[in-house]
Amino acid sequence: MITVALTLLALQPAFAQTAQSLPTIDLYVGMHRLQTEVASKPADRATGLMWRKSMPDNQAMLFIFNSYALHCFWMRNTFIPLSIAFLRDDGSIVNIEHMQPQQETSHCPAEPVRYALEVNQGWFDNRNVSPPMKVRGLPN
């Protein structure tokens, strides 16, 4: 039994990168389109962008939670620098945090939210996106 558990643990990075097939939607911030993977299930939210080596510039991941809370994020097993926008239900940005790879510092919203949007670090800054701008196209 221990051997099986250790084998599965050893395979986790490879499995995590290939097994996650998430639905995608288009989100819009100003005139900018983001092809966005949607992580709405607990396992998908827990994995997020872990194990990935890169992400195309106009891609993102949207995290959808069932309840309003101070949903905090960290960068364990995440190899690309990211920025995260915490969003109200109307799509308005509460705050944006910048996160460094492999760091376990918590990054939290300034108020309880149900949505968080991760992009490559610098994506928001390079497009002059800041609170309280709105992200359009959020699913209900």
Across the structure, where does each feature detected by a protein language model lie?
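Bacterial N-terminal signal peptides
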Residues: 1-12
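Compact, glycine-rich, soluble single-domain proteins
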Residues: 17-140
